[in-house]
C-alpha cells in the first residue's frame, strides 16, 4: 500500500490504528524488535511506521538538506525544534520524510489517520516546526512500511506479529530504547515469555 492509497481510502480496515509488535523470532532485520503503528489497512494492503528505530540525522540536518537553512549562517532554532525526533519509519521510500502528529496542526495536505493523529508529508509542516509553530506532539519518520494485499494478514496468522490497539503516548514518546519492551508490557507479556512459548510450540 502507498501514500496515495492512504489519501484515497474510503473505510478503515481491521488493523487500522493498531500496533504491530514483532515476535522475538522475527528474522527480517528491517523489522526485528520493532513496534509499528498501522495508519491504513484495506483489501489492497497495509501501511504504517516503525516508531522505535532512531535515525542518526538531526532536525538541523534535515533543514540543511532541504536548503531551509544555510550552513554558513548562524542556526537558531526554538528548543522544541532542536530536540525534534527523527526516526526510521521503514524500508520503503527511506529518503522521504513523513510527520506523524497531533491533530492541533492541519494543512490541506494533512491526512487524518485516527481521531487524534494526522500524517503530513509536505515542507509546510517542517517549516512550521522549525519556527516553533508546529503541532504539540509530533515525530518525523524517514520511510514507511508497506504490505501488499493479504500479506500482513498472512504474517499475523503465521505468528510474525502481535497486535494491539495503538497507544498515542507510546507513539510520541521520545524514549526509544525500551519502547519494544513497554509495548509488550502493555499486553502483559515479555519477550522472554514469548521466546519460551515459541520454543515449546
Curated annotation (Swiss-Prot):
Disulfide bonding pattern of the chain: none
**Which SUPFAM superfamilies does the protein's record reference?**
VC0467-like
One Pfam family this sequence matches: DUF179
Give the UniProt entry's GO cellular component terms: cytosol
- Database matches in NCBIfam families: PRK00228.1-4
Can you tell me which family this protein belongs to? Belongs to the UPF0301 (AlgH) family.
The name this protein goes by in its record: UPF0301 protein RHECIAT_CH0001061
Which species is listed as the source?
A: Rhizobium etli (strain CIAT 652)
